[in-house]
A protein has these predicted regions:
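A glycosyltransferase accessory/donor-loop signature
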Residues: 1-3, 8-9, 166-315
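Active-site beta-to-alpha loop of glycosyltransferases that engages the nucleotide-sugar donor
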Residues: 9-15
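Short, acidic, metal-binding catalytic loop of nucleotide-sugar glycosyltransferases
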Residues: 23-32
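Short internal beta-strands
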Residues: 34-42, 129-130
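Active-site-proximal specificity loops/subdomain of glycosyltransferases
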Residues: 45-94
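GT-A fold catalytic core of metal-dependent nucleotide-sugar glycosyltransferases
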Residues: 66, 70, 84-137, 160-161, ...
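A short, conserved beta-to-alpha structural element at the edge of catalytic cores
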Residues: 127-147, 257-261
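A recurrent flexible, glycine/aromatic-enriched loop bordering the glycosyltransferase active site
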Residues: 148-158
Length: 315
């Protein structure tokens, strides 16, 4: 049976979604087979679906599904939450044929084979995820959620989901109910906070390279990183981490590891690229970045800035 990977996106987010999917396919072990499931706000045109399917030049995806989500979420939830976050909550109900599935945000570039994740025994745990580090405003935020251990707060952009157990405990309904309470109005990251509250104590920690968020890269945050992870984990993130653009988006301008996104974007078919306008300045910056001498100087300056910031922090 192919391994189910789920993504959610709107029609105006087809380009980032396609870029993420291409990175998943190109990084897969040749013996891996995936079932790619797209939860979309409205039906994609047949031509766009075909272009997306055409990304698989390696025969990695044995099945593609495009699920029209229009009308599946009560209108009361719109306006307060992103469409994608609401669709993600319904995954356990949408995929009754699977006991486990992997969900990814569409602002991630995958640089690892994902099939090994499906060999993890989740037991009675609900989720597998990457824990966020305690830095800055995160510290007070995580504590405000009244978790027994605030160091066990995961980023919900990359989730190994125990669908069988989630269905057993009616997790989707609990999520929707929580998001309609007064308490939820104080959540900084609504559905992510809800996942952490409801699944707390039933989460398996995944290696950080599976979901390398922005704060896993600058040296200024390394001390906080090492309170949760090891130096080997730090090296793995920087060598081959799945880059999650949790803040600045590379198609809009400069972002940490922005070139990784463009490495895949440039290989999309033109008919897909036309679905969204990307920043011309960001594209020019990428071309400079890839120029042997100029690019190396530019990268060296950014690294020096990062090092200087870290040194000043320690003084």
């Amino acid at each position: 049976m192919p391994l189910p990977i789920v993504v959610c996106y709107t029609t105006n987010f087809v380009v980032p979604a396609a870029t993420t999917l291409l990175s998943i396919i190109e990084s897969a072990d040749p013996n891996t087979t995936y079932h790619i499931i797209s939860l979309v706000e409205a039906p994609l045109s047949p031509s766009i679906e075909q272009r997306i399917k055409g990304l698989d030049k390696r025969g990695i995806v044995s099945k593609w599904s495009f699920i029209d989500m229009s009308g599946r979420v009560p209108s009361a939830y719109f306006g307060s939450f992103s469409i994608g976050s609401l669709y993600r909550i319904l995954i356990p109900k949408l995929l009754p044929e699977y006991d486990t599935a992997l969900y990814l945000d569409c602002d991630i570039i995958v640089q690892n084979d994902l099939s090994k994740l499906f060999s993890i025994d989740l037991g009675e745990n609900l989720l597998g995820g990457v824990r966020e580090t305690l830095i800055g405003a995160n510290i007070d935020h995580f504590k405000s959620l009244e978790l027994n251990d605030p160091t066990w707060y995961i980023n919900s952009g990359f989730l190994l989901m125990n669908l069988k157990e989630m269905r057993r405990v009616n997790f989707s309904k609990k999520m929707m109910d929580l998001l309609q309470t007064e308490r939820a109005k104080s959540f900084v990251f609504p559905d992510q906070d809800a996942y952490n509250i409801l699944a707390h104590g039933k989460i398996i920690s995944l290696p950080p390279y599976y979901n390398s968020i922005r704060t896993f890269y600058p040296s200024i945050y390394k001390d906080a990183f090492l309170k949760l992870y090891t130096n080997d984990d730090w090296k793995a993130v920087h060598r081959h981490g799945n880059v999650h653009y949790t803040s600045a988006k590379p198609w809009k301008g400069y972002a940490i590891q922005f070139d990784k996104w463009w490495d895949y974007y440039i290989h999309l078919p033109e008919s897909l690229k036309q679905q969204m306008e990307v920043s011309k300045k960001a594209h020019k910056l990428y071309n400079i970045w890839k120029t042997p001498i100029i690019g190396q100087i530019f990268q060296g300056l950014l690294k020096a800035k990062d090092t200087l910031t870290t040194l000043l922090k320690k003084k």
